[in-house]
């Protein structure tokens, strides 16, 4: 088993929900010359997983072109500008918030898997070992900031205002027994904070790129109840494109 396969399987082992994957339906509609499907994705695991199904899609008349992108903004901008046919890196709450703020006509085409958000540290092995008053880095985009705070609440580390919901921010923290200082950072930069912060809340894909194995190295991690399934996103009206249906 090569390193790439091991890396992918490590993430999938941590995913409580495997909702789709390399098992694709057969289509009568295929072309003699393959039709290109251009998909933007973050490299790990999304890009790796797409590369694994290229042969399956080619057999259905689709040439899958994977464009690897390393941030959470560019994939949606390129999709809206018709430079991509689809993207694969985000969950529905993030897409809904991003599309609303930027006034983009984008929609989910289908759910794929949950990439769990987890707490990681290079200094501590258990969350109980993190000293009171320590700095914890969390994502600064609205949906993933709320997601990180709900992770802490679900583990009994903080308490949020009852009406905070999926838009919770650090201002909604009403109880913080260990007086953690939450520092908001752009998601791709979170692994870099580990030299300074006591711990950082990092998405599974960025954690893997930083050398962590989510199933093994987390201090705390989302469970199977997480509503944040990663999706394939498309422009509105394209969800039934036969190439997209084959992908999802």
Regions found by a protein language model. Name each.
Residues 109-159:
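A conserved helix-loop-strand patch within extracytoplasmic ligand-binding domains
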Residues 68-72, 82-83, 87-96, 112-113, ...:
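Beta->alpha turn/N-cap motifs
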Residues 66-77, 164-192:
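Short helix-initiation/N-cap motifs at beta->coil->alpha
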Residues 97-109, 124, 196, 201, ...:
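Ligand-binding "clamshell"
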């Amino acid at each position: 088993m090569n390193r790439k396969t091991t890396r992918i399987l490590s993430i999938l082992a941590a995913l409580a929900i495997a909702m789709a994957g390399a098992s694709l339906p057969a289509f009568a509609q295929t072309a003699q010359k393959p039709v290109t499907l251009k998909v933007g994705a973050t490299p790990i695991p999304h890009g790796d997983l797409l590369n694994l199904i290229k042969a399956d899609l080619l057999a259905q008349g689709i040439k899958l072109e994977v464009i690897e992108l390393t941030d959470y903004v560019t994939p949606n901008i390129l999709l809206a500008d018709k430079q991509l046919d689809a993207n694969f890196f985000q969950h529905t709450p993030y897409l809904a918030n991003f599309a609303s703020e930027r006034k983009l006509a984008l929609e989910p085409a289908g759910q794929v898997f949950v990439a769990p958000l987890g707490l990681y540290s290079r200094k501590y092995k258990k969350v109980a070992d993190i000293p009171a008053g320590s700095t914890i880095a969390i994502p600064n985009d609205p949906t993933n900031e709320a997601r990180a705070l709900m992770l802490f609440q679900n583990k009994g580390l903080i308490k949020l205002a009852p009406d905070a919901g999926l838009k919770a921010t650090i201002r909604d923290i009403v109880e913080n027994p260990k007086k953690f200082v939450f520092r908001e950072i752009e998601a791709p930069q979170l692994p870099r904070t580990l030299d300074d912060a006591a711990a950082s809340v990092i998405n599974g894909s960025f954690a893997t790129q930083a050398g962590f194995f989510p199933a093994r190295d987390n201090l705390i991690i989302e469970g199977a109840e997480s509503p944040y399934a990663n999706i394939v996103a498309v422009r509105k009206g394209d969800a039934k494109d036969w190439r997209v249906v084959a992908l999802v």
